[in-house]
């Protein structure tokens, strides 16, 4: 289970693993905290790329990666891209966020938990709810919960995940 921590400028923040952190969209103070923690990559999963955040992250010497997606439409490509960033940067400390750090961030972390740590969909969904996952996103995102429950099957059958699974089997 993610270890919740409290820092100025970082809401809904937790350590998922020693190299993966999660939370809500950080402000200037939060970005400075992330830099002090040794974060090298900030993944923004908000619905659109933030030029302002990209500049602030770059000025602090971190790398900004936008993986924008609109909440009602989760798709395998988004999560494959997220997992690829993690796999391509095994020594980097990574922070992932969306606006509130609950629904999109929760789904990204759940995809990591199921793909890399072997969690069941129910275990991942339980953690998502502990970090504020709504499953219906204020009446907008009805398909989120069903997508997460079906994710293990997507992971096995969608070719977009094939490269990730091949890498994983080679590293064991």
Question: Predicted segments — roles?
Answer:
Residues 104:
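Conserved lysine of the Walker
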């Amino acid at each position: 289970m993610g270890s919740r921590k409290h820092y100025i400028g970082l809401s809904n923040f937790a350590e998922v693993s020693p190299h993966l952190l999660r939370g809500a969209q950080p402000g200037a103070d939060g970005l400075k905290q992330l830099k002090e923690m040794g974060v090298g990559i900030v993944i923004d999963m908000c619905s659109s790329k933030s030029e302002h955040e990209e500049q602030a992250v770059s000025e602090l010497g971190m790398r900004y990666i936008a993986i924008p997606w609109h909440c009602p439409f989760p798709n395998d490509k988004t999560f494959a891209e997220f997992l690829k960033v993690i796999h391509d940067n095994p020594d980097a400390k990574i922070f992932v966020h969306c606006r509130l750090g609950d629904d999109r961030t929760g789904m990204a972390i759940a995809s990591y938990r199921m793909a890399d740590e072997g969690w069941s969909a129910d275990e991942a969904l339980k953690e998502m709810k502990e970090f504020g996952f709504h499953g219906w996103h204020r009446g907008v995102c009805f398909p989120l919960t069903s997508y997460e429950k079906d994710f293990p099957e997507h992971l096995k059958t969608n070719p977009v995940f094939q490269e990730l699974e091949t890498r994983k089997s080679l590293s064991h």
